[in-house]
């Protein structure tokens, strides 16, 4: 079986000037064909200086297969590169958020969403064709107000496929076990979806640099369940972001294992607030 995202890599980590015009036009046409006047789902991208990643993300979204009517919108966090131009070239309605942070950008997308459900999308991430449908299927279940999923990293010269598989398998197991009692700790913004009305009611924190999505999940718990989806058709693929913050993949693995062991008690207890 081939790698589903392989063709998108030809425009990933590349400036927009190098993007084939045929690809841009294909993405534009396919996205136009997906946009609904009466969406059930809002697919909301945020991006800050994501010129080298956004087209690949949009290309993957243009090939979504979804039984639910949807809209795709974007939020440009006042980028200094050609991020906004890519939204325009691909025909994606977008909004400019001048206050910088993921929280402000997510909130901007939420405020403009028309769908019953809001799907977080990160511009440096690619999503499989059935991603949105699978997430919404979970949200449609009685009592579910939010859904989180899993993600993989793109293998490269510094990160072997097998090394990544070991790292991801260990991380996935921990996130899954954690999701039973403390699902908010298993939520990551790039693979998170939720009820639009309830998120507007709780709001999204804008006073923190990271963790606004987990905090939103914590607030949503008062209304129902945060489900955890492990299906491969809901598994996104992304670059390295914070996984490289601790140096090598092995060092990242050690740091995360140590943190997991220190917090192992949390796997068995619920928590209503964090300080």
Task: Locate the predicted segments by residue.
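Conserved donor NDP-sugar-binding/catalytic core segment of glycosyltransferases
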Residues: 130-161
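Cell-envelope/extracellular polymer assembly enzymes that use nucleotide-activated donors
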Residues: 40-42, 71, 215
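N-proximal low-complexity "stem/linker" segments adjacent to membrane-targeting elements
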Residues: 1-60
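Acidic donor-binding loop at a coil-to-helix junction in glycosyltransferase catalytic cores
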Residues: 209-216
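A conserved acidic beta->alpha catalytic loop
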Residues: 76-84, 125
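Short, flexible, basic/aromatic active-site loop/helix in glycosyltransferases
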Residues: 149-155, 163-185, 189
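Glycine-rich, basic loop-to-helix element that forms the pyrophosphate-binding segment
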Residues: 97-113
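Short aromatic/hydrophobic "clamp" motif used to bind/position activated sugar donors
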Residues: 118
